[in-house]
């Protein structure tokens, strides 16, 4: 499919405009209310070190990297991120929030969320401090092995949606599953997101799965190809409407470049550190305040 001849960020801006103009008004789990549409697709090239970190509002790059590495290590304690200044899971890990969804665990214990499912699918979850080494299905390792051994496979799929564990999660997965594809020496990734918060979540998710693709391409000796983003319920929270109306008026700027420059041996995805990635040329418009609905 050919790329939009305009700046690729217009895909995001146009979808936001479409939701603002045509979205169905709905109440939601958080009580905030949304404007919502069902079914959308965006495509972002990752070639030539391009990194689709949106420019019409500053995206929390450090948070993108640290959260992805947190998932790849199979970690589930939000305090690990908070110690690094990344507080995106703080509200969902709060004791009061956990109790409100019927979970009785220590503060910060998010349960069997993304990283646990990626690295230990099917294992019995105990606590965020428990060891799960050798337990469950390591979907990430299996995907990397498949890319190397059988790159033409159509089964290189990783799922975070485990119905038996949903009730134990602080928040069920919004980005549910992803699939890798190898074509002409290039690695691409398609991700399906059942629920997409267009203001805060989706810009973060675009960057996160693009980074995942770049990291796995590095490990498997491939070039990054494309990130394809499928959205189910794409929505704008009602308290984000004014902020997003402001954002869609801004012209996109050139996407930055991202280089993988490991500072030590990195043979497995969980070995990577924040310092192994170099972001060059990120020049976004100023931040726009938006509140998170938990």
Swiss-Prot record:
GO cellular component term of the entry, any: cytosol
Reaction equation(s) it catalyzes: dUMP + (6R)-5,10-methylene-5,6,7,8-tetrahydrofolate = 7,8-dihydrofolate + dTMP
Tagged with keyword Methyltransferase: yes
Broad class of enzyme this protein falls into: transferase
Coiled-coil region(s): none
Positions annotated to bind dUMP: 29, 154-155, 194-197, 205, 235-237
Entry annotation: catalytic residues: 174 (nucleophile)
InterPro entries in UniProt: Thymidate_synth/dCMP_Mease, Thymidate_synth/dCMP_Mease_dom, Thymidate_synth/dCMP_Mease_sf, Thymidylate_synthase, Thymidylate_synthase_AS
Keyword list, A-Z: Methyltransferase, Nucleotide biosynthesis, Transferase
A single MF term (Gene Ontology): thymidylate synthase activity
Domain of life: Eukaryota
Single biological process term from Gene Ontology: methylation
Enzyme nomenclature, EC number: 2.1.1.45
Residues engaged in binding (6R)-5,10-methylene-5,6,7,8-tetrahydrofolate: 197
Pathway connected to this protein: Pyrimidine metabolism; dTTP biosynthesis
Keyword Transferase assigned: yes
CDD domains the record matches: TS_Pyrimidine_HMase
Family the UniProt entry places it in: Belongs to the thymidylate synthase family.
PANTHER family linked to this entry: THYMIDYLATE SYNTHASE, THYMIDYLATE SYNTHASE 1
Protein name: Thymidylate synthase 3
């Amino acid at each position: 499919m050919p790329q939009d001849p305009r700046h690729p960020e217009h895909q995001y801006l146009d979808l936001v405009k479409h939701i603002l103009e045509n979205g169905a008004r709905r109440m939601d789990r958080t009580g905030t209310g949304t404007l919502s549409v069902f079914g959308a697709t965006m495509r972002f090239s990752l070639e030539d070190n391009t990194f689709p970190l949106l420019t019409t509002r500053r995206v929390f790059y450090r948070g993108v990297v640290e959260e992805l590495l947190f998932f790849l290590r199979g970690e589930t304690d939000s305090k690990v991120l908070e110690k690094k200044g990344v507080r995106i899971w703080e509200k969902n890990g709060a004791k009061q929030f956990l109790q409100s969804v019927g979970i009785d665990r220590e503060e910060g214990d998010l349960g069997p969320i993304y990283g646990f499912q990626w690295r230990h699918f099917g294992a019995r979850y105990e606590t965020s401090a428990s060891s799960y080494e050798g337990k469950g299905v390591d979907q990430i390792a299996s995907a990397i092995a498949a890319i190397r051994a059988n790159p033409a496979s159509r089964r290189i799929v990783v799922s975070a949606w485990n119905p038996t564990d949903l009730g134990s999660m602080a928040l069920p997965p919004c980005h549910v599953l992803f699939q890798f594809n190898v074509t002409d020496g290039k690695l691409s990734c398609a991700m399906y997101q059942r629920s997409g918060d267009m203001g805060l979540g989706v810009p973060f998710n675009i960057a996160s799965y693009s980074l995942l693709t770049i990291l796995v391409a590095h490990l498997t000796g491939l070039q990054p190809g494309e990130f394809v983003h499928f959205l189910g319920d794409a929505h704008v929270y009602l308290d984000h409407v004014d902020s997003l109306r402001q954002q869609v008026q801004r012209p996109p700027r050139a996407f930055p470049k991202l280089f993988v420059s490991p500072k030590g041996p990195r043979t497995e995805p969980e070995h990577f550190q924040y310092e192994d990635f170099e972001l060059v040329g990120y020049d976004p418009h100023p931040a726009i305040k938006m509140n998170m609905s938990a």
